């Protein structure tokens, strides 16, 4: 933080580290702030959560920034050269923050966003890496939230036991308080999330953040802030989620 006049200003740095041996060793931090941050912005950071590699090899991270009007906005940044250079285009929706990105079709990205308006998740899609965004039909209606981070992953039909393309989502399944941590599955591209495809993991209060990852074709893993520990890991069979 720097004191400028009578204001405390954030001098943030967006840093990247990389591993080329499956995480055994890591590079020194690489400052990519000048590549992606508009000088007029107050703040820029990633997700939180996970990034993805698109089918064409493009690396994508969800981001959030506070612009010159002091309004937060969610979007994405991407690299087409294995992380050497990074690009950021336009915000997906204003007054949004923590987001997760998934490639729902080749070249089509879905951004699922924490929305400061409260009540439900904002969802948008892009076909040009964030130059233009389109509101998804499920936005602000299909997935309730208490204004909290959430996790979203896409799993191709060939990569899971159900033989269906899946969107898997986790968050506190409520509009009040951070409780009822739930995993949900959509088999129609995020249009609907049937009750039969939902499993509640923790009904009590917690911080509510989570991160999903496939373990194998039959199992999804979730790392989340639970009511019984700072961080909890569980493995859930897809056959318990997809009916």
Where are these regions (language model features)?
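Single conserved hydrophobic/aromatic residue that forms the stacking wall/gate
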Residues: 1-5, 10
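Structural motif
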Residues: 11-15, 69-75, 118-124, 177-183, ...
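Entry beta-strands of beta-propeller and related beta-repeat scaffolds
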Residues: 57-62, 107-110, 160-169, 218-222
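Blade-level signature of beta-propeller repeat domains, shared across WD40, Kelch, NHL, RCC1
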Residues: 209-243
């Amino acid at each position: 933080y720097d004191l400028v006049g009578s204001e405390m200003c954030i001098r943030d740095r967006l840093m990247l580290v990389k591993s080329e041996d499956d995480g055994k060793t890591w590079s020194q931090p690489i400052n990519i702030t000048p590549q992606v941050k508009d000088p007029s912005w107050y703040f820029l950071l990633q997700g939180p959560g996970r990034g993805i590699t698109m089918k064409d090899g493009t690396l994508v991270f969800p981001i959030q920034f506070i612009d010159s009007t002091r309004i937060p906005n969610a979007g994405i940044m991407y690299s087409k050269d294995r992380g050497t250079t990074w690009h950021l285009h336009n915000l997906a929706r204003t007054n949004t923050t923590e987001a997760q990105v998934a490639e729902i079709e080749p070249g089509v990205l879905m951004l699922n966003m924490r929305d400061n308006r409260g009540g439900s998740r904002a969802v948008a899609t892009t076909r040009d890496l964030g130059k233009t965004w389109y509101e998804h039909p499920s936005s602000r209606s299909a997935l309730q939230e208490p204004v909290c981070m959430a996790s979203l992953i896409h799993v191709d039909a060939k990569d899971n036991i159900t033989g269906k393309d899946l969107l898997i989502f986790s968050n506190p399944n409520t509009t009040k308080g951070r409780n009822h941590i739930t995993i949900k599955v959509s088999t129609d591209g995020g249009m609907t999330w049937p009750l039969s495809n939902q499993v509640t993991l923790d009904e009590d209060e917690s911080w509510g953040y989570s991160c999903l990852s496939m373990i194998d074709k039959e199992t999804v893993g979730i790392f989340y802030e639970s009511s019984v520990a700072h961080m909890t890991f569980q493995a859930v069979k897809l056959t318990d989620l997809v009916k």
